A protein has these predicted regions:
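Short, well-ordered strand-loop elements centered on a beta-strand within folded domains, enriched
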Residues: 15-23, 36-43, 147-157
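Short, surface-exposed, charged loop/turn segments at secondary-structure junctions
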Residues: 35-48, 100-111
Length: 193
């Protein structure tokens, strides 16, 4: 049975981290800092669609892990200033939301409502399970912050910004044109690395 993967190997350098992502298929690796969510990996799909367009077309994969035949693991190493989150996710975690902004918002809003890492994990799962049409795995590691309270405080402003700039303006009755305009505004930061 074919599968996809996203793996992050992280080295803590003090004020920064070196992160090497390994992936195959459409599982993704990200980092999230005060400037927002940034997709580091590139989906193995047959077209050159961006993250917004691929949510609508679910591009056909060109590389998956399987026991028979050829596949490859892609790799990319980047240095990231702390504090930051390193995130890996299968498409079941992000692929059933309307926009990449929604995925960032569920990560941050679930954090804002949590008093422990376990509670954050549960709240994030509670937001993903009702919308996903797939199994999912989301891994989050936080660097440069002491505890969940520090993490909430550090990302509070970003969560509010995403809510006011991208979530509240569309509500539940968003049309494609409006979503595309918001995506065009969000996209440069999302692909900044």
């Amino acid at each position: 049975m074919p599968t996809t993967a996203s793996i992050a190997a992280v080295k803590n350098n003090g004020s920064s981290i070196t992160c090497e992502f390994f992936w195959a298929g459409d599982s993704r690796g990200y980092f999230l800092d005060a400037d927002g969510l940034c997709q580091v990996t590139k989906d193995d799909i047959k077209t050159d669609e961006d993250a917004f367009t691929n949510l609508r077309s679910d591009g056909r994969m060109s590389n998956v892990i399987h026991a028979e035949g050829d596949f490859s693991l892609n790799t990319r190493e980047i240095e990231i200033s702390q504090p930051a989150m390193i995130i890996t996710s299968t498409d079941g975690g992000f692929g059933y939301y309307g926009t990449p902004m929604d995925f960032e918002y569920i990560i941050l809003s679930s954090l804002m409502e949590s008093d422990s890492p376990e509670e954050w994990e549960n709240k994030l799962s509670e937001l993903i399970i009702p919308v996903t049409g797939d199994d999912f795995a989301v891994g989050i590691a936080v660097y440069g912050l002491d505890d969940i309270a520090d993490c909430r405080e550090h990302f509070k402003e970003r969560c509010q910004f995403i809510k006011e700039s991208y979530i509240d303006p569309v509500g539940e009755n968003a049309d494609e044109e409006q979503l595309l305009r918001l995506w065009q505004k969000y996209k440069p930061g999302y692909y900044r690395r």
